[in-house]
Amino acid sequence: MSVQLDAYLFFPGNTEQAIGFYQQVFGGQVTITRRRDVDPTATPEQRNQVINALLTGGDITLRASDREDTSISPQTRVELSLIGTDDARLRAVFDGLAGGGAVLAKLERQFWGDIFGSVIDKYGIGWQVNIGTAGA
């Protein structure tokens, strides 16, 4: 049996906008479940909260939700790493993620032989992009 890792991201009330941004970058389909869809006891303030957003297809699977926890900050999140050999696709993804964000390291050839760069997107999520050579 194979193992698959899906990233699950938490946002302070703007999950729908964030997952829409990632859909523009990666492609795929989005499914959103709001608290009102599954919790009949939700207060009026909670009804529109995204309790699960799922982006599937395209290059990746991402899951996300709104979280009321105010301790969430870019410093408490992880960086996501994209690794592959499709140079054109990974460069386009890098540029898409950089839109409205900040490039920390330009895509450049590194001492280990691959092209690597990193960016923090406009939602504060860090991304590492590593473009390897085919067959490596």
Pin down the residues of each PLM region.
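Vicinal oxygen chelate
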Residues: 2-3, 31-33, 51, 56, ...
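Short, well-ordered beta-strand elements within core beta-sheets of diverse protein domains
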Residues: 7-10, 80-83
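A short, polar/proline- and glycine-enriched secondary-structure boundary/capping micro-motif
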Residues: 74-77
